[in-house]
Amino acid sequence: NLDSDEVKQYLQLDKLTDAMHYVAGRLLNFKFTPVPEGSVPVFHEDVKVWEVTDKDTGENIGLWYLDPYAREGKRSGAWATSYRSHTTFDGNKNVLSANNSNFIKPAPGEPLLVSWDDATTFFHEFGHALHSLSSNVKYPTLNGGVRDYTEFQSQLLERWLSTDDVINNFLVHNKTGEPIPAELVAKIKNAATFNQGFSTTEYLASAIMDMKFHMADP
């Protein structure tokens, strides 16, 4: 059995953030540099900002905002948004992209530990942010994608969480600094495919219903 509390001890939000930046560097050649506090306007003191640049040329890609904590008046869930999309129509405008979560803010000096599911969602939403940061279009309205592509980049990023590269370099115990045990990693990967037959049936049922609705005689 997989003990979610045991897994949590190796999932620190700061380390996961570093892992996402590492993945973005490997995939897209992006470099994330923390922006000094107070140098960029933010809507809440909890929001952190990174400058995103090309690792080779130093070209500014944009800014990435992270608003990780729950607070009164903030909508629930996790999501990505863009405050400004890329465009060259009226000069080259860089991207202002953001990820938002609702984690409970830890006590000062304490790490924020998250579940495997929440870590997966964290990576998922970062995939949407990378989509925005990767855009290179003349008209800002063209920054999106076709409907069937909407969740592709986010679901693809999820898979990087369970890669050996990320696990071996960023999943360490929050108190001892020891790497996550191989036995626990095996349990996590096995759990990922548990009850997969039911999930597949759900997907097939949705597809069948979609076909029936569209083939019905109006």
Named regions from a protein language model:
Residues N1-P218:
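Cation-handling catalytic/transport regions enriched in His/Asp/Glu
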